[in-house]
Amino acid sequence: MKFTLSWLKEHLETEASVQEIADTLTRIGHEVESVHNPADGLEAFRIARILTAERHPQADRLQILAVDVGESEPLQVVCGAANARAGLVGVFAAPGVYVPGIDVTLKIASIRGVESRGMMCSIRELGLGDEHEGILDLPHEAPVGQSYVEWAGLDDPVFDVAITPDRQDCMGVRGLARDLATAGIGRLKPLAIPRVPVTDAAPAEIAIEDKEGCPAFFGQLIHGIQNGPSPEWMARRLRAIGFRPTSALVDITNYIMFDLGRPLHVYDAGAIKGKLTARKAQNNEKIEALNGKSYDLDPSITVIADDQGVKNIAGIMGAEKASVSGSTTDVIIECAYFDPAAVSQAGQKLGLASDARIRFERGVDPAFLNEGLQIAARMVLDFCGGKATQAVTLGEAPSAVPVISYDPSYVTSLAAMDVAPARQREILEQLGFAIDAGWRVRVPSFRRDVSVVADIVADIVRIEGLDNVPSTALDRGDGVARPIATHGQLTERRVRRAAAAFGMNEAVTWSFISEKDANIFGGAFWKLANPISEDMKVMRPSLLPGLLTAAKRNRDRGQSTIRLFEVGRRYLQEAERPTLGLIFAGERMSRDWQYGKSQNFDAYDAKTAVSAMLDSVGMPVEKLQLLGDAGDVYHPGRSGRLCLGPKNTLAVFGEIHPAILAEFNMEGPVIGAEIFLDALPLRKNSGQLRQPYAPSMLQPVFRDFAFLLPKDVPAADLVRSIAGADKNAIVEARIFDVFTGETIDENEKSLGIEVMLQPAEKSFTDAELQGISDKIVAAAAKKGARLRA
């Protein structure tokens, strides 16, 4: 919602500064997104008159102008605007002036051999709009040499305020002025309802068939108008909020909508055949709307139509065929009340948005129909002339308003604020509420958001100021334990920290994905009944689709190394499961003079990361089983799963299958992993503190072994067996070499394993070392391995 300071002062008598107004609006619940003064940076632009315009000798599209800028001698300016001509009064920028619309500081220049000492400017070049087909053409009487900002009244700050969906009454400047006045920023001026003289001529012919979609339809016919430009003050305000002035009739409806929050529509009466009727659309009816698009209608949509067809989608947008133009002489002004739900559903079905729709679907003031029509008719008569017929009022808008039994003590009990009853009454009455002696509060017709006591308290609190609500801790009842994090919360916290420590970036992706992607990653189990779009139709069965999309977006923007993780929920048929998802894409190591060409991530990077995350939550990583069959998402030969026992899968990892990467239009390799946090067992609490680490005073001993092992036996099984051969002496066992080739059997592989032995109280003797080695060989033999000769 945008408005200017001068516009606000039409309704609010105030001397408050721009900053005070902005701060107060935000304090009472209307967040000010920006305040912009169009005059900033335009102080140096002056009004100038073109004395002569001659063709440039070296360019057909350029003219050499002699420009009077109010100085003793005219200045020479080279100009390419098609409308530049002798006698035109426009806006001039001298050398040294910064032109914001084109981001250029002017200087004296030679253009095709002719010196130019400045520039005649267009609306776009001034940064005041998008019009750029020609230079500004001001009224002939505009004073040459005067500041354009001063003459045009541009020193008028523009506020941009975010109005919450429940406050339709503040979708007009007057509603905001009412709130500001209540907050002590000024005095609300009374709204004058003008008198409209009428003739005895036949009134507008209107009717209502769809009383649910259009409970009330008011209309007034005005004859003999001349639809010229709107007054400069109105055009200036509309331009300031981003509207291009079109004609007086169109500008009047837009102005009243933003001024009073009352949408209207004006029809060219000459294009109407028969009665204007509010009815349901018929099957296969179409409308060519004012936005230039065609829409197919159906009987669920309320329309305004004549004998020839639809002339308006009720509360949303009119038809091109009944629109007003410069040749319009007779008009019908529509001021109606349309059902908010019907307008909202029609707009969603047609995919059609408008400023009128926003206001109607939030609910306009049903008690302001006649007043809105009178104000519009008076403006038409004042700006366009003509004679008005008697207004026609059909139907009745909803008139029931809540009457709420209230007690001033509710503010203390609900908001912990101490506000005197007299002050509460003052606030409510200034906001438009009526209060009798027994504190029965009658809600104003324009406040659809107020229906219970808590709503009244909320109004009082926001006007008094949330800053005045004391910060008070809630009382903790006897026997109520202090809040502690659950096991699941602690687990998520630990793995999140571990992932960040591993050098990964946390991502937050949508929980909704397309049905196509869901089927790729396990199935579309939870479908939304009313999805935002087809791409957000299903609750994700895996975190990988969102992470893959994020990785692709980053790669498309030039990122060569991507490490992403997310902690979130997967939605499966039986339940939702907390999960940690990981994605590695691109280069693990960039090309380097020392290491040569770049190296991409592989499945081992994912295994290392997963192991680190599991270790952070106390899982015995060295005891986990590494199995294949990670699922169809992964490359069958470059993936695996870590299990605590054969049935409890803690994590899956590996290279994403090329077919899935093709679905996401990505090039591999891309590495992924998921850790199933709810599968992690609870850590047993012994009740004792962990003993501090005490490093041995003795040197460790390293022994290397080379074993021949059947190819179908996982290397991890052998390593785990060796590590358990003598738990008192063996600290670690790890693979340092893998070999297959002609010198060994084709069904075997050679593994080089380094074993770290740590003596406790004294160094190992040769006999002890030999005994440990024998245990290692025996443990390996249980897995089918033998020492390589």
From Swiss-Prot:
<keyword id="KW-0547">Nucleotide-binding</keyword>
<dbReference type="Pfam" id="PF01588">
    <property type="entry name" value="tRNA_bind"/>
</dbReference>
<feature type="domain" description="tRNA-binding">
    <location>
        <begin position="39"/>
        <end position="149"/>
    </location>
</feature>
<dbReference type="Pfam" id="PF03484">
    <property type="entry name" value="B5"/>
</dbReference>
<feature type="binding site">
    <location>
        <position position="459"/>
    </location>
    <ligand>
        <name>Mg(2+)</name>
    </ligand>
</feature>
<keyword id="KW-0460">Magnesium</keyword>
<dbReference type="InterPro" id="IPR002547">
    <property type="entry name" value="tRNA-bd_dom"/>
</dbReference>
<dbReference type="GO" id="GO:0009328">
    <property type="term" value="C:phenylalanine-tRNA ligase complex"/>
</dbReference>
<keyword id="KW-0030">Aminoacyl-tRNA synthetase</keyword>
<dbReference type="GO" id="GO:0004826">
    <property type="term" value="F:phenylalanine-tRNA ligase activity"/>
</dbReference>
<dbReference type="InterPro" id="IPR045864">
    <property type="entry name" value="aa-tRNA-synth_II/BPL/LPL"/>
</dbReference>
<dbReference type="GO" id="GO:0006432">
    <property type="term" value="P:phenylalanyl-tRNA aminoacylation"/>
</dbReference>
<feature type="domain" description="FDX-ACB">
    <location>
        <begin position="696"/>
        <end position="788"/>
    </location>
</feature>
<dbReference type="InterPro" id="IPR036690">
    <property type="entry name" value="Fdx_antiC-bd_sf"/>
</dbReference>
<comment type="similarity">
    <text>Belongs to the phenylalanyl-tRNA synthetase beta subunit family. Type 1 subfamily.</text>
</comment>
<dbReference type="GO" id="GO:0000049">
    <property type="term" value="F:tRNA binding"/>
</dbReference>
<comment type="subunit">
    <text>Tetramer of two alpha and two beta subunits.</text>
</comment>
<dbReference type="InterPro" id="IPR045060">
    <property type="entry name" value="Phe-tRNA-ligase_IIc_bsu"/>
</dbReference>
<dbReference type="Pfam" id="PF17759">
    <property type="entry name" value="tRNA_synthFbeta"/>
</dbReference>
<dbReference type="InterPro" id="IPR012340">
    <property type="entry name" value="NA-bd_OB-fold"/>
</dbReference>
<dbReference type="Pfam" id="PF03483">
    <property type="entry name" value="B3_4"/>
</dbReference>
<dbReference type="InterPro" id="IPR009061">
    <property type="entry name" value="DNA-bd_dom_put_sf"/>
</dbReference>
<keyword id="KW-0694">RNA-binding</keyword>
<feature type="binding site">
    <location>
        <position position="449"/>
    </location>
    <ligand>
        <name>Mg(2+)</name>
    </ligand>
</feature>
<keyword id="KW-0067">ATP-binding</keyword>
<keyword id="KW-0436">Ligase</keyword>
<feature type="domain" description="B5">
    <location>
        <begin position="399"/>
        <end position="471"/>
    </location>
</feature>
<dbReference type="Pfam" id="PF03147">
    <property type="entry name" value="FDX-ACB"/>
</dbReference>
<dbReference type="InterPro" id="IPR020825">
    <property type="entry name" value="Phe-tRNA_synthase-like_B3/B4"/>
</dbReference>
<dbReference type="GO" id="GO:0000287">
    <property type="term" value="F:magnesium ion binding"/>
</dbReference>
<feature type="binding site">
    <location>
        <position position="455"/>
    </location>
    <ligand>
        <name>Mg(2+)</name>
    </ligand>
</feature>
<dbReference type="InterPro" id="IPR041616">
    <property type="entry name" value="PheRS_beta_core"/>
</dbReference>
<dbReference type="GO" id="GO:0005524">
    <property type="term" value="F:ATP binding"/>
</dbReference>
<dbReference type="InterPro" id="IPR005147">
    <property type="entry name" value="tRNA_synthase_B5-dom"/>
</dbReference>
<dbReference type="InterPro" id="IPR005146">
    <property type="entry name" value="B3/B4_tRNA-bd"/>
</dbReference>
<keyword id="KW-0820">tRNA-binding</keyword>
<keyword id="KW-0648">Protein biosynthesis</keyword>
<dbReference type="InterPro" id="IPR033714">
    <property type="entry name" value="tRNA_bind_bactPheRS"/>
</dbReference>
<protein>
    <recommendedName>
        <fullName>Phenylalanine--tRNA ligase beta subunit</fullName>
        <ecNumber>6.1.1.20</ecNumber>
    </recommendedName>
</protein>
<keyword id="KW-0963">Cytoplasm</keyword>
<dbReference type="InterPro" id="IPR004532">
    <property type="entry name" value="Phe-tRNA-ligase_IIc_bsu_bact"/>
</dbReference>
<keyword id="KW-0479">Metal-binding</keyword>
